[in-house]
Amino acid sequence: MGQPGNRSVFLLAPNASHAPDQNVTLERDEAWVVGMGILMSLIVLAIVFGNVLVITAIAKFERLQTVTNYFITSLACADLVMGLAVVPFGACHILMKMWTFGNFWCEFWTSIDVLCVTASIETLCVIAVDRYLAITSPFKYQCLLTKNKARVVILMVWIVSGLTSFLPIQMHWYRASHKEAINCYAKETCCDFFTNQPYAIASSIVSFYLPLVVMVFVYSRVFQVAKRQLQKIDKSEGRFHAQNVSQVEQDGRSGLGQRRTSKFYLKEHKALKTLGIIMGTFTLCWLPFFIVNIVHVIKDNLIRKEIYILLNWLGYINSAFNPLIYCRSPDFRIAFQELLCLRRSSLKAYGNGCSSNSNDRTDYTGEQSGYHLGEEKDSELLCEDPPGTENFVNQQGTVPSDSIDSQGRNCSTNDSLL
């Protein structure tokens, strides 16, 4: 976001008025510029490098190309644009203590900033709905939300985000009418984001608060359903272990099927926790800024300018966090290690250890040529299927992975979660 439209002085730089000697002041300014320049450069590098790594991993490894990870790619693209087109110019604005790119780029830069934040929160909202459908309608999930439908949803998210960010700013609907704001709009070297009260409140609600409320509500429902599933799995396993040993010996597949059912759902719930961390981190990083964004137009000079800028940069830093959070996933972690040449090709299992059948499902062959003998398979069998109906213990609370919809299509829940 641009700098706030209030009358505070720029306080992130050292204050020269108290310096006893001009040379000392210049040295202090130079040291501050160098230190902040290095810090901001590291932030930009972390954002760009991390999100390029995420996008490359999903593009290269077919096992990661799931519906949910399509949305993760959209989120990474928003963070990447933030790191390439927003944060560097914000850093220059701070370090040079003035805007040097002209009025047009000032408004365009601000529009891109709003676009990235809006696209991120709306994508997180879509991910919450995606997981809600996967948890509550496992029979129909892949028929309800195919990869082509996911692409359409992503396109709609970016179109809506573009309209809500570029249109009001490029049409100047955001502009305030007081003298200081008018003078800033006319100066090529001023890029403080002076806004009128209706725009500040409406844009914050549409771009952040409304999607946030939807995301929190839907995801709370997802966790409630997931918690009930885990409780039913525990009860189911208890009943299974209480069965006669001879019955298990007569049908050895029942034990394998029960273990695979539990393992699949436990892995899915771990993925839900990872997505919850992503959403929680985004909220913690951006919520303070959007609170201040409304407060400062209601009560001018209540929020100091340096506080506004620091909270804005806290939001920027969030773009570097997501790739670190994805490392919770064994699939992503191994993909990152292979892309960085930190391990030998263990993801050969994506192609060599798996074979596709006529229903476009992936079957684990039992051999993963990418793993060396004795190496721990920390990917948790990257090609492992969800529990099949043939192995399924039909008890309350357990859900088979396959179903046939009304048109006769096979709807499998074989979707790698992060």
UniProtKB/Swiss-Prot annotation:
Expressed in oviduct epithelial cells with high levels during the luteal phase of the sexual cycle. Lower levels around ovulation. Also expressed in liver. SMART domains: 7TM_GPCR_Srsx. It is found in: Cell membrane; Early endosome; Golgi apparatus. Its main location: membrane. The chain crosses the membrane at residues 35-58, 72-95, 107-129, 151-174, 197-220, 275-298, 306-329. The modification Phosphotyrosine is found at Y141. It is a multi-pass membrane protein. It comes from the Eukaryota. A lipid is attached at C341 (S-palmitoyl cysteine). One of its GO terms (cellular component) is Golgi apparatus. Pfam families: 7tm_1. Glycans are attached at N6, N15, N23. Coiled coil: none annotated. Keywords: Cell membrane, Disulfide bond, Endosome, G-protein coupled receptor, Glycoprotein, Golgi apparatus, Hydroxylation, Lipoprotein, Membrane, Palmitate, Phosphoprotein, Receptor, Transducer, Transmembrane, Transmembrane helix, Ubl conjugation. Residues 59-71, 130-150, 221-274, 330-418 are cytoplasmic. The modification Phosphothreonine is found at T261. The modification Phosphoserine is found at S246, S262, S345, S346, S355, S356. One of its GO terms (biological process) is positive regulation of MAPK cascade. Residues 398-418 are annotated as: Disordered. A motif (PDZ-binding) lies at residues 415-418. Belongs to the G-protein coupled receptor 1 family. Adrenergic receptor subfamily. ADRB2 sub-subfamily. This is Beta-2 adrenergic receptor. It comes from Bos taurus. The lineage of its organism: Eukaryota, Metazoa, Chordata, Craniata, Vertebrata.
